[in-house]
Amino acid sequence: MEWEEESEAARQKAAAASASVVPAPFLTKTYQLVDDPATDHVVSWEDDDGGESASSFVVWRPPEFARDILPNYFKHSNFSSFVRQLNTYGFRKVVPERWEFANEFFRKGEKQLLCEIHRRKSAAATWPPFPPPPPPFFAPRHFAAGAFFRHGDGMLHGRLGALVTTTERRHWFESAALPVAPSSRLLSQLGPVIAPARRAAATPEEEALMQENHRLLRGNAALVQELAHMRKLYSDIIYFVQNHVRPVAPSPAAAAALHGLGVLRPPPAGGKAPASEVRGASGRSATSSSSLTVAEDQPTLLALRLPRTTEKIINEVSGGNGGGSTKLFGVHLSSADEQTSSGASRKRSPPQEQPPTSPAPKRTLVVEHSELRLSIVSPP
């Protein structure tokens, strides 16, 4: 008997609690606009069997629904916002062809069931944003001398025998305990934080590879800097040679020998080079041209030419086998000797005697009475 009284009291308490629960205003307003018979051409219950147990409603004309009906119940006229609110309360779209929504507690003629519809909690709310930090049981690590360790946008430099214990390092271990929510956006935000933590917990093999990688990077940077310096030095040398170094004419004996071998060609009779050669010599660099022209104060113009190709030399040697004389670079050795001797004799001609000039006065120093003085004494 007492047990029946207690059960009856529990039922009354549950009924009172259910009566005191008020459904969300959004659900009440949605039920009213769907249940209004004046707007059945825009939104209405979906009565498949024509009875009173419709469990879904259909928005037949979304533009008119957003323009004429939503402002009467809500503070906006945005149909997309209305659909998002339905999703948060557990409504689902029945068919993709039309805007039909259903919920097991949203039924025609059963308004009291709206108390059973609750708003969904967001997935991000289930994950604590900042969990309590773990106890500081991590021991500091030793780093090799001169080793670099990157952390985000900063860089740590370890010295020999020193311990790296900074706030950034402690932040690595605190960040390692952060939970990762199943959201791509949260993963992208936590990616830069988790990467240093994984790097801090690297194995000895990974640490050795990292140190080797940093050493190679430093060596590569040094080589690149040295290469840039050598390129600049090369450019300076080329500029100096092109602008400050002038070619030197060969000596008379060497010029005669080159002329005998056919390497050096004599200037024309008028003492001037053809206009094409002058233009070519002035337009080309003194160090990169194939023919070099040297102009001096005398009207002599010498042109150095490159030797002929090997193919021409072989053809001339093979063609000259039928003759009795030996050729070198297309020139008879006997004629070359004669030209050399004649050129040398012409170069050794004594210069013209010039009339003697009066001797210039000489300056001498004469010491008299421990004094120095300068006097000009004419020679006897």
From Swiss-Prot:
Gene3D superfamilies: Winged helix-like DNA-binding domain superfamily/Winged helix DNA-binding domain. The keyword Nucleus applies. It is found in: Nucleus. Keywords: DNA-binding, Nucleus, Phosphoprotein, Stress response, Transcription, Transcription regulation. Residues 268-296, 314-380 are annotated as: Disordered. Its main location: nucleus. Homotrimer. The hydrophobic-rich region (HR-A/B) corresponds to the oligomerization domain. PANTHER family: HEAT SHOCK TRANSCRIPTION FACTOR (PTHR10015), HEAT STRESS TRANSCRIPTION FACTOR B-4A-RELATED (PTHR10015:SF411). Belongs to the HSF family. Class B subfamily. Transcriptional regulator that specifically binds DNA of heat shock promoter elements (HSE). This is Putative heat stress transcription factor B-4a. It comes from Oryza sativa subsp. japonica (Rice). The lineage of its organism: Eukaryota, Viridiplantae, Streptophyta, Embryophyta, Tracheophyta.
